Amino acid sequence: MNYNSKNLSESMIKNSDVYDLLLKIPAGKVSTYGDLAKALGNPLASQEIGRILGKNPNPIKVPCHRVVMSNGKVGGYRYGSERKRELLEKEGISFINGVVSDFKKVRVNLSSKQ
C-alpha cells in the first residue's frame, strides 16, 4: 500500500469537522469543496471532502447542498444535481448556464487560510 503524504493527511479529516463547518454556511450562500479543505488545514483534500459529504447522514439539516465546485457548477449530491440546484434556488441562489451567478458574492470565506 502506498502511504504518501496526501493520503495520510486526507485520512486525518474527521466527518464531524466537515459537518460542523457546513453549519457555518448560511442559507443563500455557498462554499466549495476546496474552501472546506483549506479551512480544515488541508488544501489537497477536496476529493475527501466530497466523499464525506456523500455520506452525510442528514443532508438537509447539515446543508451539504451549499457546497459547489470551484468553477461555480453545482457538483454532485446524494439526491441528484438537479435536486441540489432546486434547494439552492429555494435559498435565493441563481444560476446562469449551470453556474452560480454572482459566485464571488455568494461564496462564503470559511477561514483565513484561503
Walk through the language-model features, giving the residues of each.
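Nucleic acid-binding interface residues in structured DNA/RNA-binding domains
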Residues: N2-Q114
